[in-house]
Amino acid sequence: MQQLNPSEISELIRARIAGFEGRVETRSQGTIISLSDGILRIHGLEDVMYGEMLELPGGRFGLAMNLEQDNVGAVVLGEFSGLQEGDVVKCTGRVMQVPIGKALLGRVVNALGQPVDGKGAIDAEEFDVLEKIAPGVIDRQSVDEPMQTGIKSIDAMVPIGRGQRELIIGDRQTGKTAVAVDAILNQKGKDVQCIYVAIGQKASTVAGVVRKLEEYGAMEYTTVIAANASESAAMQYLAPYAGCTMGEYFRDRGMNALIVYDDLTKQAWAYRQISLLLRRPPGREAYPGDVFYLHSRLLERAARVNADFVEKFTKGEVKGKTGSLTALPIIETQAGDVSAFVPTNVISITDGQIYLETDLFNAGIRPAINAGLSVSRVGGAAQTKIIKKLGGGIRLDLAQYRELAAFAQFASDLDEITRKQIERGKRVTELLKQDQFSPMSVAEQGAALFAASSGALDDVEVANVRPFEKALLAYLNSNNKELMAGIEEKKDLTDDLKKQLDAAVKQFKSGSTY
């Protein structure tokens, strides 16, 4: 038997010591000293980060939001019953993360990315942080591709481009969600992934939206993030950031995504509630001083990024493709007051707004878009050529018509030009009405706008404008399929297509009843 001498034994011990890996995990921990309204005060967390996830008893988590000299203020994510003073809280060493990837499409999740639709666990590709810095100026590409909503009045008067932030603003019950949902439905077959973030809404309302998305086959390319009215303020505050992170997955990989925040007023309310409970000093309308930053850091992440950014992000896997994340934030006003704190903040952050008016909605003009107050600051460069040619004067016509119509109430005798303008305005107003859940293709919008601009509607009774439009589109789709396909493909009205369309409209008028 071979004997080991003492020097060999000491060498073996040294080698073992050198190869030893310490598995000692040091984590700061503290105790809850007060608990009320979902807000924790924790003593003893020495090295906690701002925004760090905290491990609470019972497998729950909190979020560190106030770092003070002698304690840490944190919000509980989810249910806080069962927690009590003296409970131990541990640091996790990581910030908030949510699952991202294509596995989330077709699912309904909460603000933490956990499924709430009863369809089982989500096999996510990876996780990413909630709070991210928006792409810089050098990484961005100008907005020049259209994001078609399928709504005539929007695509003609306030066009939206891919990578734009277009605010939808109006009082309650003016059709804000309807506009956003129609925009999602219109992305079918256009290779645009959609995210719908419901903040502070009734569970029944969210269920209704999900049902409609499923009914029209839109759920297969859509993720719904629900932070319902019954959930904690912390979840309502975090939901938009979670949705944005999920949308950035597509943007950064050279794909296109559309995100709807419904609505950011409720997020601002939730943040105000959290801030006041954390004893942060209140400012105007009791909002904290950083409520502008709350929305600006969220909406700046919606952008169109250039091919270099995508190539660098994907480490050369995707080349020559730009990515975009288009945002449609919704803001609810009180009695039409767009000069309130949160509405003015979001108007100044976004690239334009679609203003929906209660009076127009009640008058049966739906979508109830106020042409004078609605604007798109960058979408004009992204508008399709045919809509630009045919719909260019519509916004001006409508604004002038509303002005003249108000003036005509007091004047008994009107000159011929004014009377014609009013008559045309009535027909254009009627033409721009559109049923919910019925987005239109570019060719259909082009044909309808062509009928208005060419004077084909001038001899049609105002009450018959919508039946005329419906019958015309049905006629063109069945008898002039090649013409409609040509317009849809070129997105332009060439001289040849214009002649064909003019002839088709005249032929329809000569032989049809509507």
UniProtKB/Swiss-Prot annotation:
EC number: 7.1.2.2
Chain residues that bind ATP: 170-177
Localization of this protein: Cell inner membrane
CDD domains listed in its UniProt record: ATP-synt_F1_alpha_C, ATP-synt_F1_alpha_N, F1-ATPase_alpha_CD
The organism's place on the tree of life at top rank: Bacteria
Residues annotated as site: Required for activity: 374
Main localization, broad class: membrane
GO cellular component, one term: proton-transporting ATP synthase complex
The keyword Nucleotide-binding appears for this protein: yes
Reaction(s) the record says it catalyses: ATP + H2O + 4 H(+)(in) = ADP + phosphate + 5 H(+)(out)
GO molecular function: ADP binding; ATP binding; proton-transporting ATP synthase activity, rotational mechanism
Membrane topology listed for this record: Peripheral membrane protein
Keywords: ATP synthesis, ATP-binding, Cell inner membrane, Cell membrane, CF(1), Hydrogen ion transport, Ion transport, Membrane, Nucleotide-binding, Translocase, Transport
Subunit composition and interactions: F-type ATPases have 2 components, CF(1) - the catalytic core - and CF(0) - the membrane proton channel. CF(1) has five subunits: alpha(3), beta(3), gamma(1), delta(1), epsilon(1). CF(0) has three main subunits: a(1), b(2) and c(9-12). The alpha and beta chains form an alternating ring which encloses part of the gamma chain. CF(1) is attached to CF(0) by a central stalk formed by the gamma and epsilon chains, while a peripheral stalk is formed by the delta and b chains.
Family the UniProt entry places it in: Belongs to the ATPase alpha/beta chains family.
Function: Produces ATP from ADP in the presence of a proton gradient across the membrane. The alpha chain is a regulatory subunit.
Stated name of the protein: ATP synthase subunit alpha
